[in-house]
Amino acid sequence: MGNFINNAPFALVIVFLIIGFVLLIKGADFFVEGSSSVAKRLHVPSIIIGLTIVAMGTSLPETAVSVSASITGNNELAVSNVVGSNIFNLMVVIGVCAMIVTVNVAKETIKRDIPFSLICAGLLLILGILGVGDKSGMMLGHFDGVIFIGAFAGYIFYMIKIALKASKEGKKVEIEGGSDEDIKLISVPLSILFIVGGAAAIAVGGDITVDAASRIASDLGMSQTLIGLTIVSIGTSLPELVTSIVAARKNEVDMALGNAIGSNVFNILMVLGIASAISPISIITENIIDLCVLIVFTICVWIFAGTRKKIGRIEGFSMVVLYLIYAVYIIIR
């Protein structure tokens, strides 16, 4: 597929990029629906399904792109895809929601989730600079990937533990896709078809997206980092933006910030963990700068959220403006 895309007309490459996005997004939807149905048939608690299968499903497109980019040596794209998605989720998705309706912020998001996401971003920054486990430095190696995956497993275990405890105490536990009503029960053969077909679509979509993005970057004289931070990251995050806008219009965005922060944690620990465990990822100076921007933006949102326990229209507008300023910066740098 790579050779075909490299020799195809530019307009056709754009079409392939869109096809790649569709395969990634719909493949993730089918995979999550099939897996959730099987888990429900096996009597796995809905809370656990919501915290694992459903939550991780939103990061499957980024996983496929970064893993494919890492394997094919497109390291800049592997890292920038994750960092770009995190910045877009945080500043644009939440910012647009807040411009439509005030986003209430849970106490746990302020005291636990945002600080942990900062720790994850800081860990990525430190490991990238030090190149732990690799002589070349400025690299995420196999050992780094193991650290990330281990941290991710610990994070999931902790979240499941506190969610089950809260549920037993009769407290309301709000988790995306974490209720029986959210999980559709479909036949076993159809579930298997969804899982296998979804996984195949994700894998193929990841390869097509990486090949098309690399070709576009080459033809337009753009770096893979810029393509990853803009076109690819925005493309894989569009479903979250559309879903959040619809939810905002229905005034159902109380979980919006918590979901965005959770997705950002998954992107760093799971996506880059798997990608670097499979194949080492080189970290360039631009990646370090973008990570610093992510950390600064996260702190800004933390301040916005912690001040009044909510994010209003002014804060939301400020977040979108900050993203646009950042977008202009990465284009002209």
Walk through the language-model features, giving the residues of each:
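Hydrophobic alpha-helical segments, chiefly the membrane-spanning helices
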Residues: 1-333
